[in-house]
Regions:
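Active-site beta-strand/loop signature of hydrolases that rely on acidic residues for catalysis
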Residues: 102-108, 124-149, 189, 213, ...
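Internal/C-terminal transmembrane anchor helices
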Residues: 62-84
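Short, Lys/Arg-rich, polar N-terminal cytosolic tail immediately upstream
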Residues: 1-3
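Beta-strand-turn-beta hairpins that frame and shape the catalytic cleft
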Residues: 94-104, 190-196, 206-249, 340, ...
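Acidic/histidine-rich helix-loop elements
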Residues: 105-121, 142-146, 233-263
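Short, solvent-exposed loop/turn segments at secondary-structure junctions
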Residues: 109-111, 143, 172, 192-195, ...
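Metal-dependent phosphoester-hydrolase catalytic domains
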Residues: 6-20, 25-58, 67-68, 79, ...
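Membrane-embedded segments
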Residues: 85-217
């Protein structure tokens, strides 16, 4: 019986090892070639933790196995260094230096509630005002005009000094009684004037666009891009409103894993379009937004290319930006051209939208 238990333990250990090895190479495997890579990239942090637990246990019962697993951990260096930022001594200074440019990217979830006097929306606007970015990039943004009890967020942001703005216009001019949805999608708000703007389609079936704006900073031009990559839409219905999200996931495990694989394949198409477009950028560039994929994924690596990940450069820890499902989902990014110096970067952990905003200060090198 004892030997049988050892056999089962060894078998489980090697199954974990095999899964871990696959998860170590997810940045190099296109989802179009192997769709299950989407699941392995999500699993990497947890498989890494399991490996450490196995090493700790095997250290007392099987030293050879412990050494094998310890050496195997080295395979995870690339994904680990993309998942964790090791700048643990860095502290965020909310007072921006005059020589730097502050930018914020945030999936605002339609500002949650566009009714006049909405407490959550007012708190979100206060957070923006408090951090005082020069440029604000938002995703899942909706602006309404008209209606007795509705407010225009565009006008509210205008009152905070964001006089320049550009929208992706994914879905506009939708009428509901006297309410008009005039903007929907991604948006760039700026306190600095635009030199030029553009939008380009990344998904024709639902008219989803990426946008960019060229701006002068310290007399030098740069271009900032933002977009919202396809959502997984795992929990769009309300049939299970009284269940927790983990129970829903278990109940729908087959549909969930299929949706993960399918959407990650769609992301591959989207990032190829974005990459091809920004490769032609005339000026140094910044890309920020909700990419709906983790730093262990092929799509993150393809999009990042030679750009700097601001969180890895100046943040600390995991940097979760979507907090509702797993504690390891850093699915919003701020990527900067090597021409920029990343001065500081933080994820503001305020549960207002379903995403946390990223705030970054940069300067020219």
């Amino acid at each position: 019986m004892k030997s049988f238990a050892k056999l089962i333990f060894r078998l489980l250990c090697f199954l974990v090892l095999a899964a871990f090895v696959v998860s170590c190479f997810t940045q190099y495997i296109p989802p179009s070639k192997f769709s299950y890579v989407a699941i392995f990239s999500l699993a990497f942090p947890y498989l890494f933790l399991l490996m450490i637990i196995i090493i700790a246990v095997c250290f007392f019962i099987n030293r050879r196995l412990a050494i094998l697993f310890l050496v195997s951990l080295l395979l995870g260096y690339k994904n680990l260094s993309s998942t964790l930022a090791f700048n643990f001594s860095s502290e965020w200074n909310i007072q921006k230096k005059d020589s730097t440019l502050r930018l914020m990217t945030w999936n605002v979830e339609d500002f949650v509630n566009l009714l006049e006097g909405s407490e959550v929306r007012l708190k979100m606007l206060h957070l923006i005002s408090q951090n005082n970015p020069d440029i604000l990039c938002v995703q899942e943004f909706t602006n309404v005009e008209g209606g007795k009890w509705r407010v225009s967020v565009r006008k509210e942001l205008d009152s905070l000094g964001y006089k320049y703005y550009f929208f992706s216009n994914d879905n506009v001019n939708t009428a509901a009684n006297d309410v008009r949805i005039t903007m929907r999608g991604a948006a760039i708000f700026s306190k600095l004037p635009f030199i030029d703007t553009c939008r380009f389609n990344i998904r024709k079936d639902i008219n989803e666009n990426a946008i960019c704006a060229s701006i002068l900073f310290n007399n030098k031009p740069f271009t900032i891009y933002t977009a919202h990559l396809a959502s997984f839409r795992l929990y769009m219905d309300t049939d299970n409103a009284n269940k927790d999200i983990y129970k829903i996931t278990y109940d729908r495990k087959r549909a969930v894993q299929y949706k993960l694989r399918e959407t990650e394949q769609l992301h591959e198409k989207e990032v190829r379009i974005i990459r091809n477009f920004i490769a032609k950028s005339e000026y140094p560039l910044i890309y920020c937004g909700d990419i709906n994929t983790t730093p262990c994924s092929y799509n993150y690596r393809f999009l990042k290319n030679d750009l700097q990940d601001a969180f890895l450069a100046k943040g600390s820890g995991i940097g979760t930006t979507f907090y509702k499902i797993l504690p390891t989902l850093r699915i919003d990014v701020f990527l900067a051209d090597p021409a920029f110096k990343i001065n500081q970067c933080t994820v503001v952990q305020r549960q207002l939208s379903d995403h946390y905003p990223i705030v970054t200060d940069i300067s020219w090198k």
